[in-house]
């Protein structure tokens, strides 16, 4: 392993699970979950050893593979169908291979609805190359799989590469919450994992570029302001409670420029890394120069770029192939809000001031963190090594102490040839699809998340405006979690104080303490003249 930096990836759908997105950390084994959670800068103020960064990456890369909360439809609004615009019709139950009411209800098991899926399943590359021009290759079948999912799970590499060449979505997840990249890791073909990883990064860059004009327009229409919020992290794991940080963040917004000042660089080596950090977004600059992070203590800066070297990609593939496949989803399917009560004898709705704003407090009910962990692609040696690392961390050790050097991983022996027919697969009951690919070794867990949220009608900023600001500073992962949580259907008002699950064993209380309309000196959005560029100061940004 070279001294090249390794950066973590980022990553939807309910897991029955590379966002969402879904992220992903969620494991009742506290230390394992936290390993996935702690991402960020170097292991020390001046840098880090390559072994520490590599080991750290094991537990952070799953962010590309999801924690995205599914959108909560309004009352009486059905969830949108996943079928694509194929003109074929399904005449009668005969087409469904029976009278399964679940299939009849959504047309799910009708083979004629999924011609692209069928030719991928059967490995018919010639027909696929014809259909691909006129059909939606991102369509999900009744099991939530896209054609790319099937191509990867069945090892149909020619079909997979053809789909990728036509920009088939990589981040999308099936009904079990797994992305094509996750399935590729399970199958174990290194070339396919690399191709999917590169396409995922390309699509992420394109998505950012597509959103940029809308985001700049929204920022321009939003007034200038100063916003201060406080983060307080907690955990139900005793050892972690002592090391979790708190942070006061200051956000300055002027025109289409944003500056975020924070003292929390990130979680690293099972310890919080503190510093004096500023994140600057300059909407007037070229996209490649819009994002800058300043280390105000060392007086250096780094531009946030999205390109990675060939070596970095290969190293990341090594780590993907030697780590658990992780999925976590924040399920809001049964979420509800009830007014919090106060008083001993005479109960009344709780209303208090949060900072300068009067707020109504609500209890958040039915919020469930669902997680899955797969390791069918790992050898016994891999599992023992990863377990030893986590045990060391749980006893207070650091990643830097682990002399971890991931070796170049070779492709695994393919799983046994698929014996399931297309008709058997597509007519299977929803949620009970026959398994394709390597035999699963999967552990599942669910954790009910208890939270409160304080909503204020007095706060000057609207939720939509907040979402636009948070979208800009999404490279900071805990802010991205805040954005995902706020996207839920909340009670009336603005969430001036709320609890959010940052990771399976870690929650954060976020408090919006101050807001004021203001104007600032333009110099605060510029790189100071005495700062020097350090392209590798923040390897995970």
Swiss-Prot record:
Listed Gly residues bias regions: 37-52
Keyword Lipid metabolism: no
Any matching Pfam family: Ank_2
Subcellular location: Endoplasmic reticulum membrane
Disulphide-bonded residues: none
Ranges of biased composition (kind: Acidic residues): 21-30
Ranges annotated as biased composition (Basic and acidic residues): 1-20
Region (Disordered): 1-53
Phosphoserine: modified positions: 411
Gene Ontology biological process terms in this record: protein retention in ER lumen; regulation of anoikis
Role played: Acts as a molecular chaperone for G protein-coupled receptors, regulating their biogenesis and exit from the ER.
Entry protein name: Ankyrin repeat domain-containing protein 13C
Species whose genome carries this gene: Mus musculus (Mouse)
Name of encoding gene: Ankrd13c
């Amino acid at each position: 392993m070279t001294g090249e930096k390794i950066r973590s990836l980022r990553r939807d759908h309910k897991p029955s699970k590379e966002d969402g997105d879904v992220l992903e950390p969620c494991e009742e084994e506290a230390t394992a979950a936290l390993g996935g959670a702690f991402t960020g800068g170097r292991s020390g103020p001046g840098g880090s050893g390559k072994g520490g960064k590599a080991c750290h990456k094991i537990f952070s890369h799953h962010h590309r593979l999801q924690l995205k909360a599914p959108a909560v439809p309004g009352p009486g609004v059905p969830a949108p169908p996943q079928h694509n615009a194929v003109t074929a019709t399904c005449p009668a139950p005969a087409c469904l291979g029976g009278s399964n009411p679940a299939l009849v209800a959504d047309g799910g098991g009708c083979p004629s609805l999924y011609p692209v899926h069928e030719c991928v399943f059967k490995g018919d590359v010639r027909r696929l190359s014809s259909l691909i021009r006129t059909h939606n290759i991102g369509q999900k079948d009744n099991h939530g799989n896209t054609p790319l999912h099937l191509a990867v799970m069945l090892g149909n590499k020619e079909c997979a590469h053809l789909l990728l060449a036509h920009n088939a979505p990589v981040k999308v997840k099936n009904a079990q919450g797994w992305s094509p990249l996750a399935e590729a890791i399970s199958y174990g073909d290194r070339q396919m994992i690399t191709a999917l990883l590169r396409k995922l990064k390309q699509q992420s860059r394109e998505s950012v570029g597509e959103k940029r004009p809308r985001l700049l327009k929204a920022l321009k229409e939003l007034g200038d302001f100063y916003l201060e919020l406080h983060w307080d992290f907690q955990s139900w794991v005793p050892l972690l409670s002592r090391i979790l940080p708190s942070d006061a963040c200051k956000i300055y917004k002027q025109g289409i420029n944003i500056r975020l000042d924070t003292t929390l660089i990130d979680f690293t080596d099972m310890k919080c890394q503190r510093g004096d950090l500023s994140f600057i977004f300059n909407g007037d600059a070229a996209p490649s120069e819009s994002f800058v992070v300043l280390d105000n203590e060392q007086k250096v800066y780094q531009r946030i770029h999205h390109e990675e070297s060939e070596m970095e990609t290969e190293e990341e593939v090594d780590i993907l192939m030697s780590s658990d496949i992780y999925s976590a989803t924040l399920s809001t399917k049964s979420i509800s809000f009830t007014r919090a009560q106060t008083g001993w004898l005479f109960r009344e709705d709780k209303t208090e001031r949060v900072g300068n704003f009067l707020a109504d407090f609500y209890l958040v009910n039915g919020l469930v963190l669902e997680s899955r962990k797969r390791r069918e692609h790992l050898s016994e040696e891999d599992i023992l090594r990863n377990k030893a690392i986590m045990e060391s961390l749980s006893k207070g050790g650091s990643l830097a102490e682990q002399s971890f050097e991931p070796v170049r991983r070779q492709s695994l022996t393919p799983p046994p040839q698929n014996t399931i027919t297309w008709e058997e697969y597509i007519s299977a009951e929803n949620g009970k699809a026959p398994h394709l690919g390597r035999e699963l070794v999967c552990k599942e867990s669910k954790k009910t998340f208890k939270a409160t949220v304080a909503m204020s009608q007095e706060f000057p900023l609207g939720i939509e405006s907040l979402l636009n600001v948070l979208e800009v500073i999404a490279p900071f992962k805990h802010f991205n979690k805040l954005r995902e949580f706020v996207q839920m259907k909340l009670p009336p008002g603005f969430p001036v104080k709320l609890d959010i699950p940052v990771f399976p064993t870690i929650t954060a209380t976020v408090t919006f303490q101050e807001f004021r309309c203001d104007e600032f000196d333009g110099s605060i959005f510029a790189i100071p003249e005495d700062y020097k560029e350090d392209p590798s100061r923040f390897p995970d940004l």
